């Protein structure tokens, strides 16, 4: 578990979403990349192997302060893809919740949604609306994963066990945007909570 623990620490300190695992090649004596480990794979491993750990997981999201709830960047379906790109760069984010005029969450626009708009080196589609860009998603696109502030962390891990989740959108009973929980938020909480029990610190 120590290497996995160190991988989590390095991800948090560098804000990396994935890091390569290096091993020494016996034949060449050189370091070689064995695989690339992602935040999702780490959390999936924890979710599968700590199913019965109830001490830290049976706490509501609101009680542990998990996620971001202020200065949230949002967009409308009628906004252009280019405006979303500028917003992502400005706020250093990879996802923007799409809301209606009442603040109800309709969808999310992700960095990967930009790729079809610049395919072939043609950038005209960047002037199209976010709604148009989302229509280019494959039919099996997973859509939004959401939770409420009262959902417990173990229910989030249950979702991670079953689905490939990159983030959760926190909404109220009317599906209005409250916050966003990223995978790094969850990893940070798991590390801090575990280190507090051991009397250690991340810094």
Where are these regions (language model features)?
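Short, structured patches in soluble enzyme cores that scaffold and shape functional sites
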Residues: 23, 38-41, 77-79, 100
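Preference for long, well-ordered alpha-helical segments
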Residues: 32-33, 38
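Tandem CBS (Bateman) regulatory domains
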Residues: 39-73, 85-86, 110-161, 183-203
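Alpha-helical scaffold segments of alpha-solenoid architecture
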Residues: 94-118
């Amino acid at each position: 578990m120590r290497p996995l623990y160190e991988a989590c620490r390095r991800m948090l300190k560098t804000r990396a979403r994935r890091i390569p695992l290096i091993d020494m090649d016996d034949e060449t004596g050189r370091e070689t990349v064995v695989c690339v480990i992602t935040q999702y794979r780490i959390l999936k491993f924890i979710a599968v192997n700590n199913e019965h750990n109830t001490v830290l997981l049976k706490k509501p999201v609101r009680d542990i302060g998990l996620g971001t709830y202020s200065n949230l960047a949002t967009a409308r379906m009628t906004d252009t893809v280019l405006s979303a790109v500028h917003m992502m760069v400005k706020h250093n984010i990879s996802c923007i919740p799409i809301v209606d005029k009442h603040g109800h969450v309709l969808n999310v626009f992700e960095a990967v949604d930009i790729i079809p708009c610049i395919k072939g080196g043609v950038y005209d589609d960047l002037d199209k609306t976010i709604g148009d860009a989302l229509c280019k998603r494959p039919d099996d696109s997973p859509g939004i994963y959401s939770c409420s502030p009262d959902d417990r962390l173990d229910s989030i891990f249950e979702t991670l066990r079953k689905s490939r989740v990159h983030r959760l959108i926190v909404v109220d009973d009317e599906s209005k945007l409250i916050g966003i929980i990223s995978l790094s938020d969850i990893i940070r909480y798991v590390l801090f909570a575990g280190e507090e029990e051991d009397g250690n610190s991340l810094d």
